[in-house]
C-alpha cells in the first residue's frame, strides 16, 4: 500500500513525523507537506505562482504551497506511481465542529478524496498540544491511526472523508462515531499598534462548543462531546454542502 501523508503544520512538524513512523509497517509512506505552517488554508490551491517541490530526504518532500497543493501535486504527476490512501495530519490542535471550514488538514484530505482515493484527516486535541515539539508527544495518537487503518477503513460514498480527532490523553477510552458540533462565535479581534505606528489586528480565538438541543436525544453525540470525554471522534463529512431539506421550500418561495 502506498500512503500519502500531508498536513498544514509543515513538513518538519512532529505530528507528521510521528504519523509517518507509525504507518511505515503498512507500506510505503511518502510525506509531501508545506515547507512552513499553512494552517487555516482550507482547500485553497495556489494559482498565481509556480510551485516548487523540494526533496528533503527519501520519500519526504516540501512544497512552497498549501496543504491541498501538496496532495494535488502528489496525485497528478509528481510521482510515477499511484497512492492508495491519503492521511492528513496529525494536526497540532483540534479540528472540531466549524473548524473544518478553515482547516488545511481537512482541506488536504478532501483534495485526496477528489482524486478518488480514500482519505482521512487526523488531529490531536488538547490544551497543551500546541507546545509539543517532539514526535513522541504524538505517539499514542499515531499508534491509534495505525491500528485504525490496519483494521480496514470503512467504504464511504464518493466525496466523503473521515474527520478524526484524538484526545490528548494517556489512555484512550475508545472510539465514537460523531456528528459535527457547533462553536460559539469567535472571540473578538484584538487591535494593536505596531512599532511603526500602524494599526494591526489579530483574529480572535475560536469560540467554545455549543450544544445542539435537537441532537442531544440521539445516541450519536457531537465530536466535541466525544473528545471531551476521552474518546476518539470519528465524523464522516462531505464536500456537498447543499441543504437538501429546504430545496423544495426554497423553490416554492422563489417561484
UniProtKB/Swiss-Prot annotation:
Q: Quote any Pfam family the record assigns.
A: SurE
Compartment(s): Cytoplasm
What cofactor does this chain's UniProt record say it requires? Answer: a divalent metal cation
Q: Which Gene Ontology terms cover its molecular function?
A: 3'-nucleotidase activity; 5'-nucleotidase activity; exopolyphosphatase activity; metal ion binding; nucleotide binding
Q: Supply the alphabetized keyword list.
A: Cytoplasm, Hydrolase, Metal-binding, Nucleotide-binding
Q: How is the cofactor bound?
A: Binds 1 divalent metal cation per subunit.
Class of the enzyme per the UniProt entry, highest EC level: hydrolase
Q: What cellular component GO annotations does this protein have? A: cytoplasm
Q: Which residues bind a divalent metal cation per the record?
A: 8-9, 39, 91
Its recorded reaction(s) are: a ribonucleoside 5'-phosphate + H2O = a ribonucleoside + phosphate
> What EC number(s) would the UniProt record show?
3.1.3.5
Q: Which HAMAP family does the record cross-reference, listed alphabetically?
A: SurE
Q: Which family does it belong to?
A: Belongs to the SurE nucleotidase family.
Q: Main role?
A: Nucleotidase that shows phosphatase activity on nucleoside 5'-monophosphates.
Cite the NCBIfam families for this sequence. PRK00346.1-4 (NF001490), surE (TIGR00087)
What PANTHER family does the entry give? 5'-NUCLEOTIDASE SURE (PTHR30457), 5'_3'-NUCLEOTIDASE SURE (PTHR30457:SF12)
Protein name according to UniProt: 5'-nucleotidase SurE
Q: Which source organism does the UniProt entry give?
A: Acinetobacter baylyi (strain ATCC 33305 / BD413 / ADP1)
